[in-house]
Amino acid sequence: MRRGTRPTAKLLIVAVACAALVVGLVGLGFGLISRMNGSASDSVDEALTAIGDDPQAALEYLAPEEDGNVDEDGTWVPGQTTTDRWAMLTSRNWHKHTPGLDALTAAIGAASSFRNRAPSETDPDVSATADARATYACGRAMSYFGGEEFTKKSFTDIMKRNLAVVAANSSEDVSTAAINGALGAGATSAGLEATDISTLIYRFGDHQDAMTTLATGLGQYHHNKLKEAMNDPDANENDLRDEYHQVAASSSYLQTLSEFRFADDKKKDSEEQKTTVDTSLSVLNAVSSAGLTALTDEAAAPALAFTTGSTIAKPLI
C-alpha cells in the first residue's frame, strides 16, 4: 500500500469483482439495476478507475497470481477466474460507456509496467510470475483493442495515451511485428497477430504524445539490445548490424503507420503529421543510440535504410 489512506490491492480487486458480478447477474435477467443507485456499468467504471494508478492491483485483477501458472515456455496459462473476467471485459458494451474504456485502458497500462521485471536486489517485491502475467494481459489487450470491436473513432485521447503505454512496455512484440509484419498470425512470441499490433498503433498514430511514448519505449528496448550486442565478446560486426537493422525497421514501421492514419484522415503532409512523425522518430533514434558511441570506441553507427511500407498489411480502420 503506497499511501496510508489507499485501500489495499485485495480490497480494490474485491470491489471490481463485485461490480463485475452485478453486471453478469443483470445480463441474466435478475434486474438488480433497478435496486441500485446508478447503473452497474458505472460501478464497473468506478472500480476500474480505483486500480488505474495501482500497477499491482491492476495486474492482480487482470491476471490473478493464484489463478494460473507459468508453463515450461514461460507463458502464463490463465485459470477459469481470469478467463471469465476477460470474457466479461471484452463482451461488455463499452460503446455506451466510453469513459469506462478510459479506466480499463488505464488499468491495463498500469499492469503493463510489470513486463520484463523480475525479483532482484533493486526490485525485491516483484512476483516471480509478474512478467508472464503482464505479458498475458498486454497480449489480450492489444488483440482486443487492435481487433474488429473498435475503429479509429472509438479511441479517446486518454485511451490513446494509455494504450501507447501498453505498446511501449511490449516493445519486443512491436519490434517483431515491424520485421515480420507481412507474416500475419503468430508474428510475435506471444502469438499476437501482426495486424492487431499494426492496427492498434495506427489507431493512436495521429496522437503526438502517444506516438512519442511508444517511440521512447521502443527506443529503450533497442538501446538495451544494442548494448548487449556491443558488450558480448562473441558478437561480431554482423550481429551489431542486425541490431541496427531492427532499429531502422522499427523507425520505418512507426512512420508508415502514423502516415497511414493521417492520410486516412485527409491530413497527409499536414504540419500535424510532420510534427508527430518527426518527433517520434527523433525520440526513437535518440534513445536507442544514447551513450553507445563510447562502447564502440567512438565509431559511428552504420546508416541502414529499411522500408516497411510495402510489407505492412493495411490496418483495420
Where are these regions (language model features)?
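Non-catalytic all-alpha helical scaffold/repeat segments
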Residues: 1-15, 22-317
